[in-house]
Every structure is written in structure tokens, then in C-alpha cells.
Amino acid sequence: MSKIESQAGELQEKLVAVNRVSKVVKGGRIFSFTALTVVGDGSGRVGFGYGKAREVPAAIQKAMEQARRNMVKVELIEGTLHHHVKGTHAGSTVFMQPASQGTGIIAGGAMRAVLEVAGVHNVLAKTYGSTNPMNVVRATIEALADIKSPEQVAAKRGLRVEEILG
């Protein structure tokens, strides 16, 4: 399903999906390939890219470049999430919650690739609805981007961190 493509500098790159698509023209079909990739630094930055070309390597290259341009910051604490979070894109809904040390990444398919490159080591996650890799990746990154640290929540509410954490 997903494989480690390369280690460019400090970024981890994973290929999530490759599809053959076709365009029907008067003379027949023109085939091309699409690639979905995720890129992360392993410590809280992650992005995804979608590339399309006549050859697989070119599609992967385009996707990797787009993923590097579209990275977002994720708030993590000791390799897990601050709080449970839900993300939705199109027909896909993802739910993630923090897990204790040693749990590992309990997630399937495209969501696992995103969490691995983002630097999340312990998480419980579930996908509901569509399992289309593109929608799952978008929903996962949207959910990760929504995570707020206790410091951010305290600042927004005008309280001290101790009051937020109880």
C-alpha cells in the first residue's frame, strides 16, 4: 500500500497510491498515471501532494514537489496528540485519539502513512465512510492541523494553562 520512497535531507517521503487513469479521444485511449504522496520531517510537519504524468516516476516527482510546498505544522506532545480530534473531507471521516507510550500507530491505509511521516508514534485512529486514499489523507491532515496545545487554548480563553488542564 504505502512504501518509503526516499529520505531527501531530513524529510521522510512516502508513496501512498499510484493509479492509472485514461482519457478517451477520437483515436482511442490516452493513459497516464497519478501519484499521491506524503512528506514529513518526523517532528510535526507534514504535507501531501498529488501528481499526474504520462510516466509513473514523473507523476511521483510532481507529487513529492507539491507535498514539500504544502506542509502544515502539527502540535504533538511526546510522540502523540494533545487531545482527540476528528477530520472530514468529502465522504471520509477520520477520528484520532492520543495513546499511551508503547501503543504504536493503530491506523490503516493512507492514514498510517500520514501519521508516520508527521512524527506521531502512539495513536488510535479510525476511518469512517469512504476509504479513498486522497480523501483520507486530506481528512487526516485537516484533523492534525486542528490540534491545539494547552498553551494555545489557554491564550485563546484568557486563562492559565493549569486552569485548562484541571
UniProtKB/Swiss-Prot annotation:
Pfam families: Ribosomal_S5 (PF00333), Ribosomal_S5_C (PF03719). GO terms for molecular function: rRNA binding; structural constituent of ribosome. InterPro entries: Ribosomal_Su5_D2-typ_SF (IPR020568), Ribosomal_uS5 (IPR000851), Ribosomal_uS5_bac-type (IPR005712), Ribosomal_uS5_C (IPR005324), Ribosomal_uS5_N (IPR013810), Ribosomal_uS5_N_CS (IPR018192), Ribsml_uS5_D2-typ_fold_subgr (IPR014721). One of its GO terms (cellular component) is small ribosomal subunit. Residues 11-74 form the S5 DRBM domain. GO terms for biological process: translation. It comes from the Bacteria. SUPFAM superfamilies: dsRNA-binding domain-like, Ribosomal protein S5 domain 2-like. Keywords: Ribonucleoprotein, Ribosomal protein, RNA-binding, rRNA-binding. Part of the 30S ribosomal subunit. Contacts proteins S4 and S8. The N-terminal domain interacts with the head of the 30S subunit; the C-terminal domain interacts with the body and contacts protein S4. The interaction surface between S4 and S5 is involved in control of translational fidelity. With S4 and S12 plays an important role in translational accuracy. Located at the back of the 30S subunit body where it stabilizes the conformation of the head with respect to the body. Belongs to the universal ribosomal protein uS5 family. This is Small ribosomal subunit protein uS5. It comes from Tolumonas auensis (strain DSM 9187 / NBRC 110442 / TA 4).
